[in-house]
């Protein structure tokens, strides 16, 4: 099911411009997070991760606000093996150290108890979903790519991104706002 514009997600609609924007955002996120996992962010790793996640969440929000992408068939072509993101995951875990694990209500409407999550897992999960869509996009199947990115944003990586965004924001906020208690004042 090749998509050079002839296979629109809905009759009469051209999804290629949005697919191009999402593909560029996905590449930027993957490249940025990979650089940070390699240690290129130094002491600014957490604020830079906050920026990366905020930017990809904006892209996801555009997908969530768009009409549903409907494929003409009810199947998704195979894109090959899932990427091995262990180097990314372990690199992020090493950079985040004690700030990697956090507690979250994954679904604030359904979950009554907080669950432990890891930022490194969340970011690798987001990257995996974005890469899956990029594999469709780079194979010339922009409709399938867009369908995948939209579906997986609503169902999977958007949830991980939202949780990671809150956790990263909390780390940045604590670093900037927490004041050590002055023993002379207490």
Model-derived segments and spans:
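Alpha-helical repeat scaffolds in large eukaryotic proteins
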Residues: 27-38, 54-65, 90-93, 97, ...
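Heme-based O2/NO sensor domains and their adjacent alpha-helical segments
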Residues: 63-107
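Short secondary-structure capping micro-motifs at structural edges
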Residues: 73-77, 113-118
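Low-complexity intrinsically disordered segments
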Residues: 2-20, 24, 186
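Acidic, proline/glycine-rich low-complexity IDRs
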Residues: 1-7, 114-117, 125-186
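Short, charged/polar, low-complexity loop and linker segments
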Residues: 102-114, 139
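Amphipathic, non-membrane alpha-helical segments in soluble helical-bundle scaffolds
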Residues: 16-19, 23, 43-46, 82-85, ...
């Amino acid at each position: 099911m090749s998509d050079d514009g002839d296979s629109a997600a809905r009759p009469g609609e051209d999804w290629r411009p949005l697919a191009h924007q999402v593909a560029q955002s996905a590449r930027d996120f993957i490249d940025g997070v990979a650089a940070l996992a390699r240690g290129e962010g130094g002491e600014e790793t957490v604020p830079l991760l906050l920026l990366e996640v905020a930017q990809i969440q904006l892209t996801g929000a555009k997908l969530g606000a768009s009409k549903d992408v409907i494929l003409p068939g009810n199947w998704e072509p195979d894109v090959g093996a899932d990427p091995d993101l262990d180097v990314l995951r372990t690199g992020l875990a090493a950079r985040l150290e004690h700030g990697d694990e956090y507690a979250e209500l994954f679904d604030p409407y359904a979950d009554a108890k907080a669950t432990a999550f890891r930022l490194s897992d969340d970011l690798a999960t987001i990257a995996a979903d974005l890469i899956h869509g990029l594999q469709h996009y780079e194979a010339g199947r922009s409709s399938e790519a867009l369908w995948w990115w939209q579906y997986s944003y609503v169902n999977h990586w958007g949830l991980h991104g939202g949780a990671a965004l809150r956790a990263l924001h909390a780390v940045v906020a604590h670093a900037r706002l927490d004041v050590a208690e002055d023993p002379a004042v207490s």
